[in-house]
Amino acid sequence: MSDYCDNEFIESQEDLKIFGLRVRELRKKSKLTQSELAEKIGLSTNFIGMVERGERNTSVDKIFKLSRAFKLSLAEFFKTL
């Protein structure tokens, strides 16, 4: 599966950074490494790192995968954003 797609979800650089911090927070709370999270959702470790640093946009599909990996609904996933 490719990490990249044309259907990017987040528009502003500031929002990308906030989203990335949320992903990192949830990953650490779940006691997962970037590699473990990447394997769990079928993406590369590099992609997870770039998302967490706010350097890479993502798609709705990947956001669903992330929320499922953290065992959260989308509402819970975005709760503190």
Predicted regions, residues:
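Short C-terminal boundary/hinge segments that cap the last helix of small helical domains
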Residues: 71-81
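Short alpha-helical DNA-recognition segment
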Residues: 31-50
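Helix-turn-helix DNA-binding elements, focusing on the entry/boundary residues of the two helices
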Residues: 23, 34, 45, 60-63
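Short, basic-rich loop-to-helix N-cap that marks the start of a DNA-contacting helix
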Residues: 55-65, 74
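The DNA-recognition helices of helix-turn-helix-type DNA-binding domains
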Residues: 44, 55, 81
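N-terminal flexible/basic segments that precede or flank functional cores
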Residues: 1-25, 29-30, 35, 68, ...
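Contiguous, function-dense segments enriched for cysteine-driven chemistry
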Residues: 28, 43, 59
